[in-house]
């Protein structure tokens, strides 16, 4: 078993423990665990559709086609209530990663980067050299909004407020919100350190969405 598998399973166990221990008395440990797992499944469903399917396969690689309204609405939903991922920056970094995998120009990691450096790069990646995300869909207002710095900050409050509105306990909500965010970071690191798939991506790729 590789270390990123260990990290992933450890984060899932941590989320389960947090869900049970921080649950308010009306829920109890069992109820808290159930709510925590349901919240994790919601994040997994929405973010799993948004990041690997829409951003990765749909826009970055043009391997899947989606209606543009579906892309934009899912982008706003995920970034507002679930996990924030800047769509334009992510596509740009991902195309750099495939064009310069594990060498100079790859914003995710270099061949010599170890465990801790790669983990650090999940939050603070190397600077991209080019603008490889010039797709027309990024000029639409929902994608411009989701790619803005102000929205990135506001989304941290809206995603927490969403959890608090469900459980009505700020400590429990904060525990769920933080543990799921940690799991998402761990999953991003696993994707970054895993084997590279696919080929290089040219700069002027158009999105595979349809009107």
Put a short name on every predicted segment.
Residues 82, 138-142, 200-211:
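Active-site-proximal inter-transmembrane loops
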Residues 1-186:
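Non-catalytic, topology-defining segments of multipass membrane proteins
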